[in-house]
Amino acid sequence: MTNAFSDFAETMSRSSTSRNLPETPHYHRVAVLGGGEDARLIAALCLSEGADVTLFSAYGAELKSLRSSSGVTLRGAGPVGTYQVDRENVPSIKACAQLDEAVAAAEVIFLSGPVHKQRTYAMVLADHLSDGQVLVLAPGRSLGALETAWFLRIGGC
């Protein structure tokens, strides 16, 4: 039995190393929709990878709080540190209250927050999306992607 497993492992190793796997694209312009903790985390992680990041929130209180803070602080495993918001002459997250401005130049758009907010965004996003933009739902554990796709299709995407 050990020989059969060794043969299997060797065969799998050869087959997986001989394939040309597609290169992961690097996106430079990212929009994050939502002002909660998930959105702030995603924005800081994207900034830590060198992306130009715009964080959209329709709620002025969220943006005011974010702008008056020292930034978004990440601790633990992975990138750590404080990532600035709306600061001049340093890489920082751009906070924005206009949806069209937030998504216009984005290559990737992260849609964060609970399902009912994702639904609202999906209903208005169709008018603002362009061909080639990537839309990512975070979190994606609730079949919200199906509902979002449905609303986008109804909206003309």
Please name every model-derived segment.
Residues 4-28:
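A short, basic/flexible loop-to-alpha-helix module at the beginning of a structural domain
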Residues 29, 52, 134:
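Residues at the starts of beta-strands that form the adenosine-phosphate
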Residues 30-34:
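Conserved N-terminal Rossmann-fold NAD(P)-binding element of oxidoreductases
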Residues 37-39:
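Hydrophobic/small residue at the entry helix of a nucleotide-binding pocket
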Residues 43, 47-48:
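Gly/Ala-rich phosphate-binding loop of Rossmann-like dinucleotide-binding domains
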Residues 52-105:
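Conserved N-terminal Rossmann-fold NAD(P) cofactor-binding segment
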Residues 109-110:
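N-terminal Rossmann-like NAD(P) cofactor-binding module of classical short-chain dehydrogenase/reductase
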Residues 115-157:
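Rossmann-like NAD(P)(H) cofactor-binding subdomain of soluble oxidoreductases
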